[in-house]
Amino acid sequence: VQLSWVVLYDDAGKVMQSIGFMRDLTAQHNAQKRIKELAYTDVLTGLPNRLLLSQRVETAIADAQEQSGGFAVLFLDLDRFKIINDSLGHPFGDRVLQLVAERLQTCLRQTDMLCRLGGDEFVIYLHGGNATVAEGVSRRILDEMLRPFTLDDMGFSIQCSIGIALYPHDGLSVDDLIKQAD
């Protein structure tokens, strides 16, 4: 709620009238919140997008430089996903991507971040992750993806490819790390 007042004076400077205005800002607040959500999240999966990933990794880079630490970035894409879209349609493929996102999320810690770049490409930021952690998470993901998916009474499996990049060894920026992991 926004309150504002206007005071009206006569020629002698004496208050003649005082008018108060009250404005409900709920709709404006909700619109700003929605704009922020759209700016930072993937519409299909609800996951963070590249912009939010970039901010998170830039913060991690600053922290790692101060503390001489590191982290890992995984680049994941679904193998032969185009076949699903071409044979079963994009709406079905979109639902598959949502299922994949849910399943990937179960393989991560709360401090990690799963992002969808677009299409069938995902990036995972592993907070404080080293090569051992990155390999363990990658194996967990590969094992989880081997479990069959079921959608519209149809069972199918999806394989994925995962690349790993470690900060600072494989790159000093978000783009370098993603490129190296890809």
Residue ranges and their predicted role:
Residues Y9-K14, D170:
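Flexible loop/coil segments at beta-strand boundaries within sensory signal-transduction domains
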